[in-house]
A protein has these predicted regions:
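Glycine-rich, small-residue loops and helix-cap segments
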Residues: 25, 82, 207-315
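Short glycine/serine-rich loop segments
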Residues: 1-85, 261-269, 274-279
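Acidic-enriched catalytic cores of C-N bond-cleaving enzymes acting on peptides and small amides
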Residues: 76-99, 112, 121-152, 159, ...
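Short helix-loop capping/hinge segments that flank enzyme active sites or metal/cofactor-binding pockets
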Residues: 110, 163-230, 267-277
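Acidic/polar loop patches that form or flank catalytic/metal-binding clefts of enzymes
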Residues: 28-31, 57-58, 82, 92-98, ...
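Hydrophobic/aromatic ligand-binding patch that stacks against planar heteroaromatic rings
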Residues: 17-19, 137, 254-258
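Active-site-proximal beta-strand/loop segments in catalytic clefts of secreted hydrolases
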Residues: 29-33, 52, 116-119, 150, ...
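A short helix-breaking turn/cap at a secondary-structure junction
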Residues: 47-134, 303-315
Length: 315
């Protein structure tokens, strides 16, 4: 249940987000494939960080898609994000996407953020009303916010993840399953079919993956490479065009899930229920810079809320 009221909780890492938001723990772990960290961060008003894919090992994690899975961390304290993240990183020879973080310190060199706005969802009105104080405080602190329309883009996520899960789950079950448990994806789905009341969430997704025609490994590899490049090029083009390092959103976008770069949700207003958050993203490997930015913006958000409360009292 969402601690803020009768609202949706988000994706499959919602349990971690709820535990953090409710104060049951200081930090929790989750895994993002396509929104499973970011969406619960939005819905439950917590800091949810998806590192660059490959910086944190996926070994032992129940897989959905080895092409896109990325472990991350959720907290109520932005400073704790960095502490937990640095304790998780390390090269894992068993993870074919694993690589080493080059630098342990990085501060943003430019105070410019590109904010992608989906006007059809009323996001511009939200910026002009409930987030007006936050934007004003950003400017007072030297930040330049450039508003652009959210580009429309789609990826072959369903095809890739549905192909991945059949092989990935089978491999996982062979390694970690016991003798009395299914040893293949097909066996797992059949087991779930026998107990439909116990598996209400995600069953349709598993059935779709089972029914989807399989593609060759070489074709899958090419498709993954094309989609990752498409996402990274989109991000790079926007940041390069506006000479910026960070791009923000008022709702989840899957560019960083697909491209692999870091992203993080940042609660900016608790005056409404559920809280209002933004999502920030950066280029691959720019993890510590985005964590530094999130920490700085969290202080600005607190100042904006304080100013807004004073204004409400004066009225």
């Amino acid at each position: 249940q969402n601690p803020h009221g009768n609202f949706p909780c988000g994706g499959s890492s919602a349990g971690s987000a709820i535990a953090v938001a409710a104060g049951f723990c200081d930090a929790a772990l989750g895994t993002e494939t396509r929104g499973s960290l970011m969406i619960p961060g939005f819905r439950n008003g917590v800091y949810s960080f998806k590192p660059t894919r490959g910086l944190v090992s996926r070994t032992g994690i129940i897989p959905l898609s080895s092409s896109f899975d990325a472990p991350g961390v959720l907290t109520r304290n932005p400073a704790l994000l960095k502490e937990v993240f640095l304790s998780m990183i390390g090269v894992d020879p068993a993870d074919d996407q694993s690589f080493e973080l080059r630098s342990k310190e990085s501060k943003p060199s430019r105070k410019r953020i590109i904010l992608c706005v989906n006007r059809s969802l009323g996001e511009m009105e939200l910026l002009q009303t409930k987030l007006r104080s936050f934007l004003a405080q950003l400017k007072l602190n030297g930040f330049e916010i450039i508003f652009i329309d959210l580009p429309e883009v789609s990826f072959d996520y369903t095809t890739i993840s549905s192909t991945d899960i059949r092989a990935d789950i089978t491999k996982f079950l062979h390694r970690y399953g016991s003798d009395n448990e299914p040893r293949s994806f097909e066996g797992l789905v059949e087991c779930y079919r026998e107990r439909p009341h116990a598996h209400l969430y995600g069953m349709e997704r598993l059935e779709d993956a089972l029914a989807m025609p399989q593609i060759e490994k070489s074709e899958l590899k090419k498709l993954v490479q094309e989609n990752v490049a498409k996402a990274r090029n989109l991000i790079d083009d926007i940041l390069a065009h506006y000479d910026a390092d960070f791009v923000g959103f008022l709702n989840f976008v899957d560019w960083f899930s697909i491209g692999g770069g870091p992203s993080c949700t940042l609660p900016v207003s608790f005056e409404t229920k559920p809280p209002i958050s933004i999502m920030l993203g950066a280029r691959v490997g720019n993890d510590l810079a985005i964590l530094h930015l999130v920490k700085e913006l969290s202080e600005i958000a607190k100042a904006a809320q304080h100013v807004e409360k004073l204004g409400n009292k004066a009225e």
